Protein backbone atom coordinates (compact mmCIF):
# COMPACT_ATOMS: atom_id res chain seq x y z
CA UNK A 1 0.00 0.00 0.00
CA UNK A 2 1.17 3.49 -0.78
CA UNK A 3 0.18 6.50 1.32
CA UNK A 4 0.15 9.61 -0.84
CA UNK A 5 -0.10 13.11 0.58
CA UNK A 6 -1.19 15.55 -2.13
CA UNK A 7 -0.64 18.96 -0.55
CA UNK A 8 -1.08 22.41 -2.04
CA UNK A 9 2.12 24.38 -1.54
CA UNK A 10 5.64 24.04 -2.85
CA UNK A 11 7.99 26.15 -0.75
CA UNK A 12 8.16 24.67 2.71
CA UNK A 13 10.81 25.51 5.32
CA UNK A 14 13.77 23.15 5.62
CA UNK A 15 12.56 21.71 8.92
CA UNK A 16 9.41 20.45 7.18
CA UNK A 17 11.42 18.55 4.57
CA UNK A 18 13.70 17.14 7.26
CA UNK A 19 10.82 15.92 9.41
CA UNK A 20 8.87 14.58 6.41
CA UNK A 21 11.89 12.66 5.14
CA UNK A 22 12.52 11.21 8.59
CA UNK A 23 9.04 9.72 8.90
CA UNK A 24 8.90 8.63 5.25
CA UNK A 25 12.18 6.71 5.66
CA UNK A 26 10.90 4.93 8.76
CA UNK A 27 7.94 3.39 6.97
CA UNK A 28 8.56 0.09 5.14
CA UNK A 29 8.20 -0.27 1.38
CA UNK A 30 4.83 -2.01 1.77
CA UNK A 31 3.47 1.14 3.44
CA UNK A 32 5.43 3.81 1.56
CA UNK A 33 4.75 7.48 2.26
CA UNK A 34 4.93 9.77 -0.75
CA UNK A 35 4.51 13.55 -0.99
CA UNK A 36 3.06 15.16 -4.09
CA UNK A 37 3.34 18.92 -3.88
CA UNK A 38 0.66 20.82 -5.76
CA UNK A 39 1.38 24.24 -7.20
CA UNK A 40 -0.89 26.79 -5.51
CA UNK A 41 -3.00 29.11 -7.60
CA UNK A 42 -1.44 32.60 -7.49
CA UNK A 43 -3.32 34.81 -5.01
CA UNK A 44 -2.71 37.90 -7.16
CA UNK A 45 -4.74 36.72 -10.14
CA UNK A 46 -7.95 38.58 -9.25
CA UNK A 47 -9.89 35.33 -8.90
CA UNK A 48 -12.35 34.50 -6.15
CA UNK A 49 -11.32 31.98 -3.47
CA UNK A 50 -13.78 29.49 -5.03
CA UNK A 51 -12.10 29.85 -8.44
CA UNK A 52 -8.66 29.42 -6.90
CA UNK A 53 -9.74 26.31 -4.97
CA UNK A 54 -11.28 24.87 -8.17
CA UNK A 55 -8.00 25.41 -10.05
CA UNK A 56 -6.06 23.74 -7.23
CA UNK A 57 -8.58 20.89 -7.17
CA UNK A 58 -7.87 20.19 -10.84
CA UNK A 59 -4.16 19.99 -10.07
CA UNK A 60 -4.82 17.70 -7.11
CA UNK A 61 -6.93 15.42 -9.32
CA UNK A 62 -4.15 15.05 -11.90
CA UNK A 63 -1.57 14.30 -9.18
CA UNK A 64 -3.35 11.14 -8.03
CA UNK A 65 -3.05 7.71 -9.57
CA UNK A 66 -6.29 6.12 -10.82
CA UNK A 67 -8.24 4.05 -8.32
CA UNK A 68 -6.72 5.62 -5.23
CA UNK A 69 -8.90 5.93 -2.12
CA UNK A 70 -9.14 9.65 -1.33
CA UNK A 71 -9.34 11.20 2.11
CA UNK A 72 -9.66 14.99 2.37
CA UNK A 73 -8.20 16.77 5.37
CA UNK A 74 -10.83 19.20 6.58
CA UNK A 75 -11.72 20.97 9.82
CA UNK A 76 -15.19 19.38 9.65
CA UNK A 77 -13.76 15.91 9.10
CA UNK A 78 -13.90 12.84 11.29
CA UNK A 79 -11.93 13.15 14.50
CA UNK A 80 -9.97 9.93 15.10
CA UNK A 81 -7.74 8.83 17.93
CA UNK A 82 -4.37 7.49 16.87
CA UNK A 83 -5.52 3.95 17.68
CA UNK A 84 -8.63 4.44 15.52
CA UNK A 85 -6.43 5.78 12.70
CA UNK A 86 -4.30 2.65 13.02
CA UNK A 87 -7.40 0.46 12.76
CA UNK A 88 -8.54 2.44 9.72
CA UNK A 89 -5.08 2.09 8.15
CA UNK A 90 -5.32 -1.68 8.62
CA UNK A 91 -8.72 -1.71 6.86
CA UNK A 92 -7.33 0.34 3.98
CA UNK A 93 -4.36 -2.02 3.69
CA UNK A 94 -6.68 -5.04 3.68
CA UNK A 95 -8.70 -3.36 0.92
CA UNK A 96 -5.62 -3.35 -1.30
CA UNK A 97 -5.87 0.25 -2.50
CA UNK A 98 -3.43 3.10 -2.21
CA UNK A 99 -4.68 6.00 -0.07
CA UNK A 100 -4.31 9.69 -0.94
CA UNK A 101 -4.66 12.35 1.74
CA UNK A 102 -5.63 15.68 0.18
CA UNK A 103 -4.43 18.88 1.84
CA UNK A 104 -5.78 22.18 0.54
CA UNK A 105 -4.16 25.57 0.18
CA UNK A 106 -4.76 28.78 2.15
CA UNK A 107 -8.47 28.76 1.27
CA UNK A 108 -8.97 25.04 1.88
CA UNK A 109 -10.22 22.37 -0.52
CA UNK A 110 -12.82 22.80 -3.23
CA UNK A 111 -16.28 21.64 -2.06
CA UNK A 112 -16.79 19.39 -5.10
CA UNK A 113 -13.42 17.73 -4.52
CA UNK A 114 -14.25 17.09 -0.86
CA UNK A 115 -17.64 15.67 -1.83
CA UNK A 116 -15.94 13.22 -4.22
CA UNK A 117 -13.67 11.82 -1.50
CA UNK A 118 -14.37 8.61 0.40
CA UNK A 119 -13.84 10.37 3.69
CA UNK A 120 -12.97 13.57 5.54
CA UNK A 121 -10.35 13.54 8.29
CA UNK A 122 -9.60 16.22 10.87
CA UNK A 123 -6.16 16.26 12.45
CA UNK A 124 -7.10 18.72 15.18
CA UNK A 125 -9.74 21.15 16.36
CA UNK A 126 -6.98 23.76 16.25
CA UNK A 127 -6.12 25.70 13.11
CA UNK A 128 -2.74 24.39 11.98
CA UNK A 129 -0.27 26.01 9.57
CA UNK A 130 0.18 24.06 6.33
CA UNK A 131 3.82 23.12 7.02
CA UNK A 132 2.81 21.68 10.40
CA UNK A 133 -0.02 19.65 8.81
CA UNK A 134 2.46 17.79 6.61
CA UNK A 135 4.69 16.89 9.53
CA UNK A 136 1.82 16.02 11.85
CA UNK A 137 0.16 13.81 9.23
CA UNK A 138 3.43 12.01 8.44
CA UNK A 139 4.07 11.38 12.14
CA UNK A 140 0.54 10.15 12.79
CA UNK A 141 0.64 7.80 9.79
CA UNK A 142 3.95 6.42 11.04
CA UNK A 143 2.54 6.06 14.56
CA UNK A 144 -0.58 4.34 13.19
CA UNK A 145 1.65 1.89 11.31
CA UNK A 146 3.69 1.33 14.51
CA UNK A 147 0.53 0.47 16.45
CA UNK A 148 -0.67 -1.81 13.65
CA UNK A 149 2.62 -3.74 13.61
CA UNK A 150 3.33 -3.66 17.38
CA UNK A 151 6.43 -1.55 16.79
CA UNK A 152 7.79 -0.02 20.02
CA UNK A 153 7.57 3.59 18.70
CA UNK A 154 4.07 3.88 20.18
CA UNK A 155 4.18 3.07 23.87
CA UNK A 156 0.63 3.54 25.09
Curated annotation (Swiss-Prot):
Q: Cell membrane: is it a keyword of this entry?
A: no
Top enzyme category: transferase
* Residues annotated to bind S-adenosyl-L-methionine: 73, 104, 123-128
A molecular function (GO) term: rRNA (pseudouridine-N3-)-methyltransferase activity
Q: Which reaction does it catalyse?
A: pseudouridine(1915) in 23S rRNA + S-adenosyl-L-methionine = N(3)-methylpseudouridine(1915) in 23S rRNA + S-adenosyl-L-homocysteine + H(+)
* Transferase recorded as keyword: yes
Task: Name the NCBIfam families for this protein.
Answer: PRK00103.1-4
What does the UniProt function comment say about this protein? Answer: Specifically methylates the pseudouridine at position 1915 (m3Psi1915) in 23S rRNA.
| Known partners and oligomeric status | Homodimer.
Which protein, by its recorded name, is this? Ribosomal RNA large subunit methyltransferase H
Q: Which organism is it from?
A: Bordetella parapertussis (strain 12822 / ATCC BAA-587 / NCTC 13253)
